[in-house]
Every structure is written in structure tokens, then in C-alpha cells.
């Protein structure tokens, strides 16, 4: 262990008395709990920062590994890669000086930022879902807005229904007239000319007694 690494170890042990763990002479592990309020996350996992220092440290960037104490849906491979890039950039800026504390701090801050972003996305998704549900409920009370196209389609259906009703009414009246007709000639005239009740009486094809009998 070089003097620079030994000095780094002493610094880390004083800053992280419970979180620091020395894997070997050149490999350190620091477990940092993530605060619920700072991250806006109900059950955030702890950030595990592992670094391996070469004999050239601090003039050479350490090999860093970032993991978490347990899986979390907001902290996948994409987010871990983002953390590694931020740490690597900070390490380049700190070359020539003790940097592990700085790298750990940057990793924790970026983890909080990621969790806050994910929390905001989830909140927006929930609000959007509630908004759409509210719109669907409002449609039940306000109905569908009428357009030229929708009215034309409705009118077409209504006209077809109305024509069918008129046809049924005419057929019903025809059956009644046939039943009231006094002779086969009268029934024939009804079928050929579709005569009305008034015309049947005027032409003496239906007797008043027949109609009253039907009633």
C-alpha cells in the first residue's frame, strides 16, 4: 500500500466510520444510505461505492464499481451507467489529489437526482391517468360532441328506422282493412290499389256493420 492510498484510507475511515470497509490494501467499499426525503423515494436502497486504487493513485483514475443494496425499479442498468459517467468525469477533474470522498459524494447526489426525476415521472403518469379517467366520466354526463359527420350518420340511421316503422304501420292497416272487407272483390281492390278506409266506405266495399263488429 502506497502512502497516498494509506492516507486516503485514513481519511475515509474518519469520514465513514460505519460505512467504510477495506476489502484489501487497494480496494475500498463505502455503503451510503439514501435519505427518503432527499431522494423523494419511499424505500431507497443504499448506494454501494467500490473503488480499486492503483499504485499511481491519485495521478490515475481509480477503477469504480457502483451497485445498490437491493434492486429498485428506478435504478436499473441505464441509471447505473449514468452514475458511472458522472463519477468518471469528476475523477478526471480531481486527478493529483485525494478524490474518493468527492466521488462518493457525487455518486450519492446523482442518485438522489435520479430518484427525484423518477418520482416526478411517476407522479405525472398518475396525474395523467386520473385526468383521462375524469374525461371519460365527464363524457358520460355531457355526451359526445355533435359534428356534421356524426349527425349525418345518426340521421341516416333514424330515417331507416322511421321508414321501417311506417312500413309496419301500413301493413298493419292493410291487414285490418282486409279483415273488414265485405267481399273478395273488395279485398282484391284493396290489394291492387292500396285503398284507404275512407275510399273503401265511399265505394261500398266495407260495411259499417263489419267495422263495428271488428271493433
UniProtKB/Swiss-Prot annotation:
PROSITE patterns: RWD. GO terms for biological process: cytoplasmic translation. It comes from the Eukaryota. It is found in: Cytoplasm; Nucleus. The keyword Nucleus applies. Its main location: cytoplasm. One of its GO terms (cellular component) is nucleus. InterPro entries: GIR2-like, RWD_dom, UBQ-conjugating_enzyme/RWD. Residues 7-114 form the RWD domain. Keywords: Cytoplasm, Nucleus. CDD domains: RWD_GCN2. This is RWD domain-containing protein C1393.09c. It comes from Schizosaccharomyces pombe (strain 972 / ATCC 24843) (Fission yeast).
